């Protein structure tokens, strides 16, 4: 039997998602640990308990924003060696994936990155992840005793109430980093809520010109929705910020309502919207793959359909 699960994310929301999932496995895999970097208020510690943490390990007196992946990996690996947890769940951000690889190397452990689901099958913890460019889903089992898994953001729902009572809190020390942070520059990017939006509108190559995005933006305003896009519009055409790219190489979203406009529906994009509560697709190609996953489909020219939607929504609200 595993001696526990250690959870780490540089963001509170990621911690809550991973803790919720880890709590489902306590009877089979042992207690849930959480690592906290820097000084945290008591309310934050209590939140970790509410989401399932039974043991909280803190490293006070450090600025988590200045710690490099190696320093964090060292702490995680030392916890796994000395405190007991055999399974490490790490949020699969850019930093998280680097940390996961470093921790696995230090522990001599197997590592799965970008997992989208976790389940117990017999004696095994099975992780599923997209492979072959998102065209297939692979089920993978790590055979080493220590196991490192990085989990894609928003793969699980964060649910409080997983645990009650107090948790054991223990302070740890961290050695001086071998890498010194000389300067930190914030990347200039527009602010958006693509990942957390209740309503999300994604536009694809069905839009002919950058100037035509105005009709999509008007629709977003009318529907109180965030704008997302497929990879070509952001990475190839540069019509939309890459911060709004949805799919296997972009954001993973769980809106209550997702409207897909001029999107063909290739798997590289749809993996980012699979968890939407309701999907509405607008495409003039009746055979577009997007209709296979849509709850509602409209076969029509987006240049006619979208403005009409906008007009009717505005009329209904006046």
Kindly label every feature range from the protein language model:
Residues 1-318:
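N-terminal glycine-rich FAD/FM-binding segment characteristic of electron-transfer flavoproteins
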């Amino acid at each position: 039997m595993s001696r526990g699960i250690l959870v780490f994310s540089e963001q509170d929301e990621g911690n809550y998602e991973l803790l919720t999932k880890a709590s489902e496995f306590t009877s089979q895999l042992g207690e849930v640990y959480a690592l906290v970097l820097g000084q945290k208020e008591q309310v934050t510690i209590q939140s970790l308990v509410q989401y399932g943490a039974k043991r909280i390990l803190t490293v006070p007196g450090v600025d988590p924003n200045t710690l490099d992946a190696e320093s964090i990996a060292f702490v995680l690996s030392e916890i796994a060696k000395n405190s007991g947890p055999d399974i490490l769940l790490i949020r699969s951000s850019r930093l998280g994936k680097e940390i996961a690889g470093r921790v696995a190397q230090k522990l001599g452990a197997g590592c799965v990155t970008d997992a989208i689901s976790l389940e117990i099958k017999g004696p095994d913890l099975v992780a599923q992840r997209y492979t072959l460019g998102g065209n297939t889903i692979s089920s993978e089992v790590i055979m080493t005793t220590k196991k490192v898994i990085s989990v894609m953001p928003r793969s699980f729902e964060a649910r409080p109430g997983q645990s009650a009572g107090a948790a054991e809190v223990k302070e740890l020390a961290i050695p001086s980093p071998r890498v010194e942070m000389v300067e930190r520059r914030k990347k200039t990017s527009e602010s958006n809520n693509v990942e957390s939006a209740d309503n999300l509108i994604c536009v694809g190559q069905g839009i002919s010109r950058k100037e035509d995005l105005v009709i999509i933006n008007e629709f977003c305003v009318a529907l109180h929705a965030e704008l997302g896009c497929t990879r070509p519009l952001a990475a190839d055409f540069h019509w939309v910020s890459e911060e709004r790219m949805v799919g296997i190489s972009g954001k993973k979203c769980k809106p209550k309502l997702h409207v897909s406009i001029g999107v063909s529906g290739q798997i590289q994009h749809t993996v980012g919207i699979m968890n939407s509560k309701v999907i509405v697709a607008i495409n003039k190609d009746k055979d577009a793959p997007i209709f296979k996953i849509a709850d509602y489909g409209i076969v029509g020219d987006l240049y006619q359909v979208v403005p009409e939607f906008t007009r009717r929504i505005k009329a209904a609200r006046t």
